[in-house]
Amino acid sequence: MELNQVTLPAHDVVASVAFYRSMGFELIVDAHHYARFKSLKGDATFSISACDPVAASSNTVLYFECADLDTQVRALQAIGMQFTQEPKDEPWFWREARLVDPSGNVICLYHAGVHRLNPPWRV
């Protein structure tokens, strides 16, 4: 099996569609209550689905790996994206930056290199 899609809750589908399109994702399904996007690299997809406002305590984090994290963050900041965490080296050997979509879902852009699948503590 291969993980292909994750669906996030969205209390404002229109704003969320605009947000993810501005990040560069390709919109492949667009309905009033649902939208699906394709990654620019590979065939993975993710979607948003209309719901009541997302609880502030949501633990959902959507991760997107970037070959050059700092350049990607600067490009998104140049079009007005606000990050809650600037690129930072983490103790688990990933470099991460975070922002929040219009529905409160946390988006983590990161670069992990070989450590994504092969951290030193891998079982």
Protein language model features and the residues they cover:
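Short, flexible active-site-adjacent loop segments at beta-strand->alpha-helix junctions, enriched
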Residues: 7, 41-43, 52, 103, ...
